[in-house]
Amino acid sequence: MKSGIHPNYVATTVVCGCGNTFETHSTKETGRINVEVCSQCHPFYTGKQKILDTGGRVARFEARYGKRAGKGAAKESAES
């Protein structure tokens, strides 16, 4: 490797908004990285995930055009 072109790779402390800290290595010179969420407080990892069904595009599409598969299946069974 060429000398003088690579950044320094230093031990870095990552500090989460929830108070969790852990050590890693980074090229950031301050030695500290502040983050908003981590694996200890993120809802996906903690299991406290909320599923929000706001009835977006799919619901508007079905309201506008109806469920075509349901109508087609009913016609086929009536013909048989």
Curated annotation (Swiss-Prot):
<feature type="binding site">
    <location>
        <position position="38"/>
    </location>
    <ligand>
        <name>Zn(2+)</name>
    </ligand>
</feature>
<keyword id="KW-0689">Ribosomal protein</keyword>
<keyword id="KW-0479">Metal-binding</keyword>
<dbReference type="InterPro" id="IPR042105">
    <property type="entry name" value="Ribosomal_bL31_sf"/>
</dbReference>
<dbReference type="GO" id="GO:0046872">
    <property type="term" value="F:metal ion binding"/>
</dbReference>
<dbReference type="GO" id="GO:0006412">
    <property type="term" value="P:translation"/>
</dbReference>
<comment type="function">
    <text>Binds the 23S rRNA.</text>
</comment>
<keyword id="KW-0694">RNA-binding</keyword>
<dbReference type="InterPro" id="IPR034704">
    <property type="entry name" value="Ribosomal_bL28/bL31-like_sf"/>
</dbReference>
<dbReference type="GO" id="GO:0003735">
    <property type="term" value="F:structural constituent of ribosome"/>
</dbReference>
<feature type="binding site">
    <location>
        <position position="41"/>
    </location>
    <ligand>
        <name>Zn(2+)</name>
    </ligand>
</feature>
<dbReference type="InterPro" id="IPR027491">
    <property type="entry name" value="Ribosomal_bL31_A"/>
</dbReference>
<keyword id="KW-0862">Zinc</keyword>
<protein>
    <recommendedName>
        <fullName>Large ribosomal subunit protein bL31</fullName>
    </recommendedName>
</protein>
<dbReference type="InterPro" id="IPR002150">
    <property type="entry name" value="Ribosomal_bL31"/>
</dbReference>
<comment type="subunit">
    <text>Part of the 50S ribosomal subunit.</text>
</comment>
<comment type="similarity">
    <text>Belongs to the bacterial ribosomal protein bL31 family. Type A subfamily.</text>
</comment>
<dbReference type="GO" id="GO:0005840">
    <property type="term" value="C:ribosome"/>
</dbReference>
<dbReference type="GO" id="GO:1990904">
    <property type="term" value="C:ribonucleoprotein complex"/>
</dbReference>
<keyword id="KW-0687">Ribonucleoprotein</keyword>
<feature type="binding site">
    <location>
        <position position="18"/>
    </location>
    <ligand>
        <name>Zn(2+)</name>
    </ligand>
</feature>
<keyword id="KW-0699">rRNA-binding</keyword>
<dbReference type="GO" id="GO:0019843">
    <property type="term" value="F:rRNA binding"/>
</dbReference>
<dbReference type="Pfam" id="PF01197">
    <property type="entry name" value="Ribosomal_L31"/>
</dbReference>
<feature type="binding site">
    <location>
        <position position="16"/>
    </location>
    <ligand>
        <name>Zn(2+)</name>
    </ligand>
</feature>
